[in-house]
């Protein structure tokens, strides 16, 4: 793997917990791409005067619904000991908010964004900027390019590294942006600047890596032909929104497709860099209200026979019944086993899957699984176990590429 491991960090609580618990030596060899997102919805927010929930479109134009400021502050504070990281804004509508929409406005050369980035650097953060491409609906081509160039110019005067991230499977016209900036990019690089193009594949379904790799290799050839040997990051995730989208109800195993995608691209373009989402799916489930409980599940990322993720999951068992009163009527309700019983059970199954299970040294996530199997379940929250998976994933990726400092 060329240079550091680039980690897209989407600033959810589970991701911040994983990052805090990742060994500091491992954090030192990871380059985060911090994608600022909306944060949690504030209590009783997101409703109109009649108490009716706002539509998705209304949410994006209503300020004060989400705790955006608190989220970006805590996310950037978590990065304070990084040697450097890229700062970006979310492109996922479900993770955006009115504050993000305003911050990413293209007016006056993305003035609000450039000011925000420079202000954060004044606070001592070793951040590097990512170019935004978010033209107003009524912008013509000249205005589009003018604002993009002004943004690049502002950043090039204050930074030696600049990134451009594109949803490569969706935007087939992004080369227009790069060609529009070619004189500026060339001048920046001639003066010692480093320009990174992050090809974000977002979610790549396990088994589809080869198809994406062939297309991406062609895209990279086009980039090199126009801009020379700029620095390209191949970024993706293959962890599904729901494990049952790719596997069985209780147990399955699937390939870490982003590794396969990267290795296929590297066969023809040896200088590309690796990036992933730390096993996080691009779509977040934090606004789903769980009324019927959930099935305890623990995931493990293995380096056996390449990189794979496997999971064990259990439906809670009925251990008795009790009488309850519902709207004045007596009914019999099942009593289910405690979540901790099932987390202990699935942790034991995770550790018992030979030869895929391997002890990961100096890993908080691995320690949490061992503790749970022994009866000391750290948490019954699904968010906690997402953090466990993410911390193990990062550790195993570093080991897989031979750059684990531990």
Regions found by a protein language model. Name each.
Residues 113-293:
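Eukaryote-skewed repeat-based solenoidal scaffolds used as protein-protein interaction platforms
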Residues 1-127, 135, 234, 241-406:
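Alpha/beta catalytic barrel-like cores
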């Amino acid at each position: 793997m060329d240079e550091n491991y680039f980690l897209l960090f989407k600033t959810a609580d589970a991701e911040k917990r994983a990052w805090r618990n990742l060994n500091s030596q491992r954090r030192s060899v990871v380059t985060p791409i911090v994608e600022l997102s909306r944060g949690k919805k504030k209590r009783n927010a997101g409703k109109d005067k009649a108490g009716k929930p706002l539509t998705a479109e209304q949410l994006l134009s209503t300020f004060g619904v989400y705790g955006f400021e608190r989220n970006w502050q805590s996310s950037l504070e978590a990065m304070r000991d990084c040697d450097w990281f890229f700062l970006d804004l979310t492109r996922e509508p479900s993770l955006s908010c009115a504050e993000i929409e305003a911050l990413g406005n293209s007016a006056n050369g993305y003035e609000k964004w450039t000011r925000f980035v420079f202000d954060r650097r004044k606070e001592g953060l070793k951040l590097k900027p990512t170019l935004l491409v978010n033209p107003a609906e009524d912008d013509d081509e000249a205005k589009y390019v003018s604002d993009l160039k002004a943004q690049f110019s502002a950043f090039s005067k204050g930074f030696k590294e600049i990134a451009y991230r594109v949803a490569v499977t969706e935007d087939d016209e992004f080369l227009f942006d790069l060609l529009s900036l070619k004189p500026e990019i060339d001048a920046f690089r001639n003066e010692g600047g480093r320009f990174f193009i992050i090809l974000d594949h977002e979610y790549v379904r396990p088994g589809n890596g080869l198809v994406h790799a062939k297309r991406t290799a062609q895209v990279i050839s086009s980039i090199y032909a126009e801009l020379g040997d700029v620095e390209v990051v191949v970024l993706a995730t293959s962890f599904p929104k729901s494990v049952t989208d790719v596997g069985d109800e209780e147990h399955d195993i699937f390939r870490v497709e982003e590794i396969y995608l990267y290795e296929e691209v590297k066969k023809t373009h040896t200088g590309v860099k690796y990036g992933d989402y730390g096993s996080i799916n691009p779509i977040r489930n934090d606004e789903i209200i769980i009324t019927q409980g959930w099935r305890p599940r623990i995931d493990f990322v293995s380096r056996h026979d390449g990189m794979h993720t496997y999971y064990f999951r259990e439906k809670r068992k009925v251990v008795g019944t009790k009488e309850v009163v519902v709207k004045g009527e007596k009914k019999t309700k099942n009593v289910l086993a405690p979540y901790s019983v099932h987390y202990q059970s699935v942790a034991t199954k995770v550790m018992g899957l030979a030869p895929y299970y391997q002890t990961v040294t100096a890993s908080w996530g691995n320690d949490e699984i061992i503790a749970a199997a022994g009866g000391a379940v750290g948490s019954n929250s699904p968010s906690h176990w997402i953090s466990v998976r993410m911390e193990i994933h990062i550790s195993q990726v570093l080991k897989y590429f031979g750059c684990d400092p531990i």
